[in-house]
Amino acid sequence: MSPNETATQLLTLLSSHGQGDYIGEPISQLAHSLQCAHFAAQQSSDPEFIVAALLHDIGQFLPVSDVQSIAGSVQSMSGNVGRVGHETIGAEYLRRLGFSKRVTELVAAHVPAKRFLCATEKAYSEGLSEASMASLKFQGGPMSESEVEEWKGGEWWEDKCRLRKCDDCAKVVGLEVGGLETYRERIERCLGA
């Protein structure tokens, strides 16, 4: 598939499957994804960071047949709220489409980033929504000291935390942001790299 065809496939998937509730939050999954990308674009002009923000929950949008295919090849399907392992499934799906290691790692890390931030920033954990606090229990709770040190040794750990903070802010009822087509060119650039 060309970058344009892949972008069309992704934008169609988000549009057609994004109208459902965003688990425990007062907005749709699509609105959440668009807001996350909007907040990422306010922080950075880096297309990989912005595209990862837009697609961070793509594992929630995939049809069951795609999830079953991907899940068979994914090593770790640790528990989660919503679709189990959606961050891992989404990262693998994007890798198969041709996205860079950085995009896929940012997507894969948005759940563990919450665990890291809860362990290292008291104000962060105090600011989480009720639904996000509830999901934290299922995601393993705050990281241990050894997990925190390991996290800090990983690639792009600061960007992973920034993306997570965009994710947490992206729950605003009625916030007007750009639509899906706003991100087509960035998606195509990420695929053409």
Regions found by a protein language model. Give the residues of each.
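Short N-terminal micro-motifs specific to bacterial/archaeal maturation
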Residues: M1, G24-I27, V81
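Extended, non-globular alpha-helical segments
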Residues: M1-T12
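Active-site flanking loop/helix segments enriched in acidic
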Residues: L11-Q35, G59-F61, S69-Q75
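Residues that form generic nucleotide/phosphate-binding pockets
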Residues: L13-H17, Y93, L106, C166, ...
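Residue-level signal for secondary-structure boundary elements
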Residues: Y22, R115, A119, K171-L175
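Aromatic-acidic/polar surface patches that form glycan- and anion
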Residues: Q29, R83, E176
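Divalent metal-dependent catalytic cores for phosphoryl transfer on phosphate-bearing substrates
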Residues: A37-K165
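Charged phosphate-binding loop/patch that engages nucleotide di/tri-phosphates or the phosphate backbone
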Residues: K165, C169-A193
